[in-house]
């Protein structure tokens, strides 16, 4: 199944390829997969700030993906605890806890079930500071949500709902691509003075493995990273899709096409300047994400780059995304934006 999705079943590694990008020392690191890196970040967050709390469905038992393993045993059930299956209640409680000056780290078991909490996130968390004239805020709220395809999840356990929240001023939306990024970005989200939705690519929980520093570190939000330099076309993505795009870049290189690959990391607010500079250099842009193409965040990136780089473009902006259908089960390989689809789009854009 993974091969059909254009993804390798082998353990993935994520070398730092960018020139001049912010690097995190791995001198004291050890190999971790993505869920272990997140678990380490949560241990650090609870250990360094006694006002921090972790809660959600089954988190006291370690969570369905084991991201909260050992937290309740170490920090006690007053700071790490289970909740009923009520997403709007979970987020609502987190908002109240954060409004009292605490760090509320909320887990939504699957991003597909975040929709019952939509009103709490959009009309309460995102507007808390604005509607009080900055007298009150719930900036200590971080919402963790596993998202995206996993090969067998179907339409209730595979969705990518990030675009819904990118239309909401007052919150931040962050998605990591690797274990090292996940730890540093999650700690930044927890300590950021604004509410954050942190989507975790669940396909990478066990597949992605790399050296992760054991110490406390943060990676800046709203700073994209050029993880592969090139001259012919710019590719922009986030999360697990970057591994697929990297494979397409390698195949394109064999055909003489030089691809520049950018990890957006933060979707709201996103780093327009890094993408703009790259597109002005290459003259071409391809965006890829798992979410359906219509109304996906790729459309926002496309519109912005057209406004900023119109006279520099050598070809129309290309989008390789999920199909405009409910997420299928047996037809998932046809729904997904695979390596071959991306490679075809790269070639057609470069040869436009």
Curated annotation (Swiss-Prot):
Localisation per UniProt entry: Mitochondrion matrix
One matching Pfam family: Transketolase_C
Keyword DNA damage appears in the UniProt entry: no
A GO CC term attached to the entry: mitochondrial matrix
Enzyme class: oxidoreductase
One of the GO BP terms on file: branched-chain amino acid catabolic process
Source species of the chain: Arabidopsis thaliana
Main localization category: mitochondrion
Subunit structure: Heterotetramer of alpha and beta chains.
Source species, domain of life: Eukaryota
Transit peptide (residue range): 1-23
Alphabetical UniProt keywords: Metal-binding, Mitochondrion, Oxidoreductase, Potassium, Transit peptide
Function, in words: The branched-chain alpha-keto dehydrogenase complex catalyzes the overall conversion of alpha-keto acids to acyl-CoA and CO(2). It contains multiple copies of three enzymatic components: branched-chain alpha-keto acid decarboxylase (E1), lipoamide acyltransferase (E2) and lipoamide dehydrogenase (E3).
Binding site for K(+): 139, 141-142, 189, 192, 194
Cofactors (names): thiamine diphosphate
Catalysed reactions, as listed in the record: N(6)-[(R)-lipoyl]-L-lysyl-[protein] + 3-methyl-2-oxobutanoate + H(+) = N(6)-[(R)-S(8)-2-methylpropanoyldihydrolipoyl]-L-lysyl-[protein] + CO2
Residues at which thiamine diphosphate binds: 113
Protein name: 2-oxoisovalerate dehydrogenase subunit beta 1, mitochondrial
GO molecular function: 3-methyl-2-oxobutanoate dehydrogenase (2-methylpropanoyl-transferring) activity; metal ion binding
Classification via CDD domains: TPP_PYR_E1-PDHc-beta_like
InterPro entries listed in its UniProt record: THDP-binding, Transketo_C/PFOR_II, Transketolase-like_Pyr-bd, Transketolase_C
Entry EC no(s): 1.2.4.4
């Amino acid at each position: 199944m993974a091969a059909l999705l254009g993804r390798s079943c082998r353990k993935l590694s994520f070398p730092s390829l960018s020139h001049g990008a912010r690097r995190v020392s791995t001198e004291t690191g050890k190999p971790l997969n993505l869920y272990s890196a997140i678990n380490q970040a949560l241990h650090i967050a609870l250990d360094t700030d006694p006002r921090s709390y972790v809660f959600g469905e089954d988190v006291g038992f370690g969570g369905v993906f084991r991201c909260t393993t050992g937290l309740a045993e170490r920090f006690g059930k007053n700071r790490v605890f289970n909740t009923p299956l009520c997403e709007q209640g979970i987020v609502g409680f987190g908002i109240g806890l954060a409004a009292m000056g605490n760090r509320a780290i909320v887990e939504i078991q699957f991003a597909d079930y975040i929709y019952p909490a939509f009103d709490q996130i959009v009309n309460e968390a995102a507007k808390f500071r604005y509607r009080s004239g900055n007298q009150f805020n719930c900036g200590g709220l971080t919402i963790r949500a596993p998202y995206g395809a996993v090969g067998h999840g179907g339409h209730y356990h595979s969705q990518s709902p990030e675009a819904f929240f990118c239309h909401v001023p007052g919150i931040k939306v962050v998605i990591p691509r690797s274990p090292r990024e996940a730890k540093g970005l999650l700690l930044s989200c927890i300590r950021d003075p604004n509410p954050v939705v942190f989507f975790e690519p669940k396909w990478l929980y066990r597949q992605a493995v790399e050296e992760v520093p054991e110490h406390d570190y943060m990676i800046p939000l709203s700073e994209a990273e050029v993880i592969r330099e090139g001259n012919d076309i710019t590719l922009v993505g986030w999360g697990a899709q970057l591994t697929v795009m990297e494979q397409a870049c390698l195949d394109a290189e064999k055909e003489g096409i030089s691809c520049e690959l950018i990890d957006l990391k933060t979707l709201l607010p996103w780093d327009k300047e890094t993408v703009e500079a790259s597109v002005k250099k290459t003259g071409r842009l391809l965006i890829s994400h798992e979410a359906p193409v219509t109304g996906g965040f790729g459309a926002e990136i496309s519109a912005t780059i057209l406004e900023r780089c119109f006279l520099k473009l050598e070809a129309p902006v290309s989008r390789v995304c999920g199909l405009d259908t409910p997420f299928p089960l047996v037809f998932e390989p046809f729904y997904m934006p695979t390596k071959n689809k991306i490679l075809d789009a790269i070639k057609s854009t470069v040869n436009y």
